[in-house]
A protein has these predicted regions:
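Surface-exposed, short loops/turns at beta-strand junctions within beta-sandwich domains
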Residues: 291-297, 380-387
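Short, solvent-exposed loop/turn segments at the edges of extracellular beta-sandwich modules
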Residues: 306-312, 395-402
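Short, compositionally biased P/S/T/A/G/V-rich stretches that sit at domain boundaries
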Residues: 217-249, 255-262, 320-343, 412-415
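Short beta-strand segments within Ig-like beta-sandwich modules, predominantly Fibronectin type-III
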Residues: 277-284, 366-372
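Short proline/glycine-enriched turn/loop motifs at strand-loop junctions of beta-rich domains
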Residues: 262-266, 350-355
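Cysteine-dependent hydrolase recognition
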Residues: 1-251, 309
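Short beta-strand elements bearing conserved aromatic residues within extracellular beta-rich modules
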Residues: 269-271, 357-359
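Hydrophobic/tyrosine-rich beta-strand signature of extracellular beta-sandwich/beta-rich modules
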Residues: 299, 303, 390-392
């Protein structure tokens, strides 16, 4: 999935036209019976650590007498065979949860209530847990049924649940009566899409026909079984890798390179400067970059390699660089580096060829100066909590090349 792809009725990518799909999840829910911020951060950190690691574990499919497992039991055996054919262990168990299994790489079950700690099982990083029940996505107190947040608390990379009773009205002897509707829940092939290398969001939305009542929570980009390209950025002028801290000037060409195991190939490359795509090329081609049109000073250079597969797995390398064309410099100093929310931070600028400057962080302007030499004080409570990165840009005119970026400084706000 990419934001600009159009799709046909049979799931084929169209040259033009067709609906576009922008995949999304909730990173976490803190309201009601949701998770604490610490639990959400821990789960997201664990999920990010799983990317491309091909975890050694087993995906478990639970079956029991409950209609919640019978509703989608038909395709389970075929899904298990396909997962095993992809080189990942899968197993069908009787019960509600796997008991005493320390290698749970994924879970499909169906039950109104469960107690994960009592199972004695352990989730490996990157696991998707899916429980078919009516109110898994309802977090209000006393709603009944165990919410999906129990899986996030246990370390799942993602889970889902419906936010209302997922009934559909079906004809029944001449009268409409409610019945559970399996297409409102993920098909068991959710886990198959995942082990074939799709990211979490791609796996979920390929597996659900009617997701309008379904809340998906977790890391949308987690991709434990993806084969991720290792990327190198080479300066064509001297055939040397562009290393962190490198200084670049003038018009240059970059040679993107990617290596993959098992004979894989990356056939497309994209170049980003500070998160903005500025060039793209094919296999064996170069990425042009006119650094004279950019601000002097600090920039993040990113090259993304895209594999020649249906999933189009991406790998990337991000390199902080310095651009030096116009003689402008700017340094940013922040003290102290660790501060309590009730305290103040001192932010100092020292620039050459700078007429004014802006200090910003967390997407907000925090201060402005009329010169390139200045010190301002900021209440730490304005910066949020945890690691906070501050940046500064100086200017001598209206054009991008009339600016200079200071190297960013990261501080920690907390008790």
């Amino acid at each position: 999935f990419r934001g600009w792809y159009g799709w046909g009725e049979q799931g084929n990518v169209l040259e033009a036209g067709g609906p576009r799909y922008l995949l999304a999840t909730m990173l976490g829910v803190t309201a009601g019976r949701g998770n604490t911020v610490a639990e959400i951060v821990q789960a997201l950190t664990s999920a990010a650590s799983a990317d491309g690691r091909r975890p050694r574990g087993t995906i478990y499919f639970l079956t029991n007498g409950d209609v919640r497992t019978r509703a989608r039991s038909g395709p389970v055996k075929g899904t298990v065979k396909a997962i095993e054919a992809a080189g990942v262990k899968a197993e069908i168990l009787e019960g509600i949860l796997p008991q005493g299994r320390r290698d749970v790489a994924g879970l499909v079950t169906g039950t109104p209530d469960f107690d994960w700690p009592a199972s004695g099982s352990r989730l490996v990083p990157g696991a998707i847990c899916d429980n078919l029940t009516s109110f898994g996505g309802v977090f209000t107190p006393n709603a009944g049924q165990t919410p999906l947040s129990a899986f996030i608390r246990a370390g799942a990379a993602g889970a889902c649940g419906t936010v209302v009773e997922p009934y559909v009205m079906l004809p029944n002897t001449g009268a409409n009566s409610p019945a559970a509707f399996q297409p409102k829940f993920p098909h068991p092939a959710l886990q198959l899409h995942y082990v074939r290398g799709a990211c979490l969001a791609e796996a979920f939305y390929q597996a659900v026909r009617s997701p309008h009542q379904l809340l998906v929570v977790g890391d949308p980009l987690c991709q434990p079984w993806a084969v991720i390209p290792a990327v190198e950025i080479v300066n064509a002028a001297d055939s040397q890798p562009v290393e962190p801290g490198a200084t670049l000037a003038g018009k240059i060409e970059l040679e993107p390179r990617a290596s993959l195991p098992e004979g894989g190939v990356a056939d497309r490359y994209e170049l980003y400067v500070d998160g903005v795509r500025v060039a793209q090329c094919g296999l064996g081609e170069r990425l042009p970059l006119d650094t004279t049109a950019l601000a002097d000073g600090h920039h993040d250079l990113r090259v993304v390699a895209i594999t020649a597969t249906d999933i189009e797995t991406q790998g990337r390398r991000i390199v902080p660089i310095t651009i030096s064309n116009h003689g402008h410099t700017l340094a940013l100093t922040v003290e102290p580096r660790r501060v309590r929310p009730a305290d103040t931070v001192r932010v100092s600028l020292a620039g050459a060829g700078v007429e004014s400057a802006i200090i910003y962080g967390m997407g907000r302007v925090l201060g402005r100066t009329a010169t390139g030499q200045a010190t301002i004080e900021l209440p730490a409570e304005l910066l949020g909590r945890g690691p906070v990165t501050l940046r500064a840009t100086g200017r001598t005119g209206p054009n991008p090349a009339d600016a200079v970026n200071a190297p960013p400084v990261t501080i920690t706000v907390g008790e």
